[in-house]
């Protein structure tokens, strides 16, 4: 065995020696050893030869004027190329191999990429590698141009010493072009610490650079990729700058890597960007407040109206504390509710030990007149006052002849054109009589126009109480007396219809005395006059009495003062817009003057009298129809003249701003109606004038019932428009039109949306119609009326019909298709319909008492012998309000 092993090893050694000799490795080893010895000699004798050669090479590239031999030019100007296929890694760069090892092109093309730029074997022209580092100023260096001497091939000396490891090997490829990194001995050197130069200014000229030793420059500052290959350690990468690379283009390395944040999660941060410029967000910290006792005020001043929230803020309390205290006292409010009662606000303040005063400064600013018309006249200089015509209001019960009596005085025929022969609007007229001018107010007598009568009593100076001699004092007559007494106005009684045969003045005197109006004929102070509107009897005496009362009252006014008065009626005209009938109480109203009402303003454009004649001025106690208003004022609103329209607009704007502050407060639902499950009739009212709306709405709201109630969604003046119809369709409401019509283009919409619209000219007809609609909402009351009863004697089973009951009629009549109750031991087991009734196999409509019959119940099969079948019918009765 040992012999065989020795023989095998000997054969391997001989074979390896033959291979080495064939490849020429022994000669290469000798050349390498000889080259190493020559390098050491050259370096010791001329250490700066390589540096000079590098400078000369650089000069030859930059300065073409330098003369050189063709050999030197070819060797210096053309850059040296690294060819892995014809150089051995064991040979130094300065030596040239005479016989390069041939390598196939396939092997070179499949070589992996390296960090150095390696030219392909097919390149024919040399490549010039530009130096990207800032050039060194040549002026500061004194370099002698030495012509390069051609390198002589040293003699090959074979040494037996083993080859030393080469430190400066640039290429990592062997003679076959494959990696030999694992065969090379790796030696590491600590990098030298060098002071980094300061960044240079970017300019076109090269900056001066301090001179360095040739050794330092050759070791640390390589000027070309070829010259620094042997000086750099093999473990360092090529640090030569590529074109376009500069320290400004390089991203700074973050020593403290940034933590992953939410912005990274959503891709908002770019990892390559430097985010150090971002300002760090300051973390919010809880503020610690010093706890101290809140000193609540003991005396405050608040305006009215005010919300619960604002009142609590003024009192330094929580709104919940106020609401809790008010709930204890039986008042339910929420935080946004408005308090407009002075007593309620002051009571809340006393509960918390705070005195509350009402601040009226804002209201005083918006209030133009600080006193009433009567107070203003009393404060005026008597020399400026003149006697004005009396304002007389005719009041009384409906159909007692008020309007007819006025027609007789004015020689007019107003009553003939009134719908239903009753007055439903308030009229103002100027009447010239033998005793002087009189302003007459005609008020409605129907119970629905109570507000109109109240306004008439407040405006007028004398009330003429018209009483029909054949009917006597009625309900509205008593109401008119109450209004007159409340306004402290003189009453003159006109006993009308004295031409009728059943006229009895003594009965009227007795009724007047019962209400503390003792007539003069009975020794009292109440003036009474017997009149007849048809014959004109007693009219002169009535006028004389009115003139006498006006003289006693000493009615005066100041015509030079600014005009003040009251709105009698207002309406919406198609061509003129908002118009109003006003009555001047003091001063004189001229065309073009600006007026301020409660919630609107205007500039008088036109004025007309009751005969539609133009007027330029309106003196005291004179009514007029004016136009040019911003909106429609309410009946009974006072007005006053201001300097110009701008002031009037500003005043109304301030008033409306205060009203709109609380306009958005929602109406609280009627919890009583919700608990009682009351039904609601929703209405939309349209009328010709503001007074008619007021009268109709008040009459409807007076309809009181525990089962149903009326709710007015909207009320306005004018014709029924498309917006009203759409509102009614959306809210399922009924539109009530009073003395008005429907717009032409809105009639088709009524049919398409199916809205119910009812038009009326007489107010009590409208009120009666509303009552009927409210009654129709109520479910009718069902009443069960017994018709007869029968006892079950036998039961029969049928596969087709079910159970058939043989019965004997004990009471009344059993009728087919009527309701039936099955009663057992006085307990009702079932209610249903009697579907079939037979008498001796014949269908009959009814079976009377004492007869037998067969009965089939619809949907019930569980009746037994002895049960009672009671036949009854259901009668529905409408409910009453």
UniProtKB/Swiss-Prot annotation:
Q: Which parts of this chain are annotated as the region G2?
A: 421-425
Q: Which domain of life is it from?
A: Bacteria
Tagged with keyword Coiled coil: no
Chain intervals for the UniProt region annotation (G5)? 532-534
Region annotated Disordered sits at 31-147, 165-291
Q: Which UniProt keywords apply?
A: Cytoplasm, GTP-binding, Initiation factor, Nucleotide-binding, Protein biosynthesis
The ranges of region (G1) come to 396-403
- GO molecular function ontology, one term from the record: GTP binding
Chain ranges of the tr-type G domain:
387-556
The biased composition feature labelled Polar residues covers 68-77, 204-233
- Gene3D superfamilies, per the entry: P-loop containing nucleotide triphosphate hydrolases, Translation factors, Translation initiation factor IF- 2, domain 3
Q: Which residues cross the membrane?
A: none
Location relative to the cell: Cytoplasm
Q: Residue ranges under compositional bias (Basic residues)?
A: 278-287
Coiled-coil positions are: none
Q: Which InterPro entries does the annotation name?
A: EF-G-like_DII (IPR053905), EFTu-like_2 (IPR004161), IF2_II (IPR044145), IF2_N (IPR006847), P-loop_NTPase (IPR027417), Small_GTP-bd (IPR005225), T_Tr_GTP-bd_dom (IPR000795), TF_IF2_bacterial-like (IPR000178)
User: Segment G3: which positions?
Assistant: 442-445
Q: Does the keyword GTP-binding apply?
A: yes
Q: What PANTHER family does the database record attribute to this sequence?
A: TR-TYPE G DOMAIN-CONTAINING PROTEIN, TRANSLATION INITIATION FACTOR IF-2-RELATED
Its family remark reads: Belongs to the TRAFAC class translation factor GTPase superfamily. Classic translation factor GTPase family. IF-2 subfamily.
Q: What does this protein do?
A: One of the essential components for the initiation of protein synthesis. Protects formylmethionyl-tRNA from spontaneous hydrolysis and promotes its binding to the 30S ribosomal subunits. Also involved in the hydrolysis of GTP during the formation of the 70S ribosomal complex.
Task: Report what the protein is called.
Answer: Translation initiation factor IF-2
Species annotation: Chlamydia felis (strain Fe/C-56)
Q: What is the lineage of its organism?
A: Bacteria, Pseudomonadati, Chlamydiota, Chlamydiia, Chlamydiales
What gene does the UniProt entry assign to this protein? infB
């Amino acid at each position: 065995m040992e012999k065989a092993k020795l023989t095998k090893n000997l054969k391997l050694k001989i074979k390896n020696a033959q291979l080495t000799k064939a490849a020429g490795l022994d000669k290469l080893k000798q050349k390498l050893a000889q080259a190493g010895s020559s390098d050491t000699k050259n370096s010791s004798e001329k250490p700066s030869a390589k540096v000079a050669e590098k400078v000369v090479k650089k000069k030859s590239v930059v300065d073409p004027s330098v003369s050189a031999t063709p050999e030197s030019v070819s060797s210096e100007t053309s850059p040296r190329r690294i060819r892995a296929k014809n150089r051995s890694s064991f040979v130094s760069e300065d030596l040239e191999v005479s016989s390069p090892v041939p390598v196939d092109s396939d092997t070179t093309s499949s070589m992996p990429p390296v960090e150095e730029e390696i030219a392909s074997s097919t390149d024919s022209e040399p490549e010039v590698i530009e130096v990207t580092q800032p050039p060194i100023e040549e002026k500061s260096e004194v370099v002698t141009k030495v012509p390069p001497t051609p390198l002589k091939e040293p003699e090959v000396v074979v040494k037996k010493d083993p080859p030393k490891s080469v430190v400066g090997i640039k290429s990592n490829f062997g003679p076959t072009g494959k990696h030999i990194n694992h065969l090379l001995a790796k030696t590491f050197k600590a990098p030298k610490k060098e002071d980094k130069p300061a960044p240079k200014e970017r300019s076109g000229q090269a900056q001066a650079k301090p001179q360095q030793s040739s050794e330092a420059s050759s070791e640390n500052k390589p000027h070309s990729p070829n010259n620094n290959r042997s000086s750099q350690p093999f473990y360092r990468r090529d640090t030569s700058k590529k074109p376009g690379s500069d320290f400004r283009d390089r991203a700074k390395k973050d020593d403290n890597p940034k933590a992953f944040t939410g912005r990274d999660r959503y891709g908002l941060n770019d990892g390559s960007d430097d985010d150090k410029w971002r300002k760090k967000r300051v973390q919010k910290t809880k503020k610690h407040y010093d706890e101290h006792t809140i000193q609540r005020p003991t005396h405050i001043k608040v305006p009215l109206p005010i919300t619960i929230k604002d009142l609590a803020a003024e009192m330094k309390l929580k709104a919940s504390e106020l609401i809790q205290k008010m709930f204890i006292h039986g008042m339910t409010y929420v935080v946004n509710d408005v308090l407009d009662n002075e007593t309620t606000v002051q009571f809340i303040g006393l509960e918390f030990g705070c005195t509350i005063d009402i601040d009226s400064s804002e209201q005083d600013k918006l209030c133009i007149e600080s006193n009433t018309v009567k107070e203003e006249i009393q404060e005026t200089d008597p020399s400026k006052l003149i006697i004005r015509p009396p304002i007389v209001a005719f009041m009384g019960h409906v159909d007692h002849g008020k309007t007819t009596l006025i027609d007789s005085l004015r020689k007019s025929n107003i009553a003939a054109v009134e719908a239903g022969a009753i007055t439903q609007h308030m009229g103002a007229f100027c009447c010239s009589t033998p005793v002087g001018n009189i302003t007459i107010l005609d008020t409605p007598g129907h119970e629905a126009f109570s507000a109109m009568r109240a306004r008439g009593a407040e405006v007028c100076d004398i009330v003429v109480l018209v009483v029909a001699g054949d009917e006597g004092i009625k309900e509205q007559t008593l109401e008119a007396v109450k209004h007159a007494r409340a306004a402290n106005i003189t009453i003159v009684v006109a006993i009308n219809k004295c031409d009728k045969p059943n006229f009895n003045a003594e009965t009227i005197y007795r009724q007047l005395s019962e209400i503390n109006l003792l007539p003069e004929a009975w020794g009292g102070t109440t003036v009474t006059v017997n009149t007849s509107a048809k014959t004109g009897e007693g009219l002169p005496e009535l006028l004389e009495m009115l003139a006498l009362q006006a003289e006693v009252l000493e009615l005066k006014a100041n015509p030079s003062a600014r005009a003040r008065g009251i709105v009698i009626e207002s309406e919406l005209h198609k061509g003129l817009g908002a118009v109003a009938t006003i009555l001047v109480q003091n001063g004189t109203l001229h065309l073009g003057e600006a007026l301020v009402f409660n919630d609107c303003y205007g500039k008088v454009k036109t004025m007309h009298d009751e005969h539609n004649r133009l007027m330029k001025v309106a003196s005291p106690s004179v009514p007029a129809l004016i136009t040019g208003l911003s909106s429609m004022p309410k009946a009974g609103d006072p007005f006053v003249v201001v300097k110009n329209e701008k002031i009037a607009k500003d005043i109304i704007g301030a008033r409306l701003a205060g009203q709109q502050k609380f306009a958005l407060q929602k109406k609280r639902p009627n919890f009583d109606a919700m608990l009682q499950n009351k039904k609601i009739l929703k209405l939309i009212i349209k009328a010709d004038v503001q007074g008619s709306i007021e009268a109709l709405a008040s009459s409807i709201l007076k309809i009181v019932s525990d089962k149903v109630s009326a709710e007015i969604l909207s009320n306005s003046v004018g014709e029924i428009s498309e917006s009203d119809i759409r509102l009614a369709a959306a809210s399922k409401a009924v539109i009530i039109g009073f003395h008005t019509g429907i717009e032409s283009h809105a009639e088709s919409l009524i049919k398409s949306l199916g809205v119910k619209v009812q038009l009326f000219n007489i107010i009590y007809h409208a009120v009666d119609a509303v009552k009927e609609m409210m009654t129709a909402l109520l479910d009718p009351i069902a009443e069960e009326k017994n018709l007869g009863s029968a006892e079950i004697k036998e039961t029969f089973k049928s596969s087709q019909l079910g159970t058939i009951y043989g019965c004997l009629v004990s009471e009344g009549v059993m009728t087919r298709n009527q309701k039936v109750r099955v009663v057992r031991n006085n307990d009702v087991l079932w209610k249903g319909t009697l579907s079939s009734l037979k008498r001796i196999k014949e269908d009959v409509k009814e079976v009377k008492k004492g007869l037998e019959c067969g009965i089939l119940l619809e949907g019930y099969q569980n009746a037994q012998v002895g049960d009672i079948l009671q036949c009854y019918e259901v009668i529905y009765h409408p409910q009453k309000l």
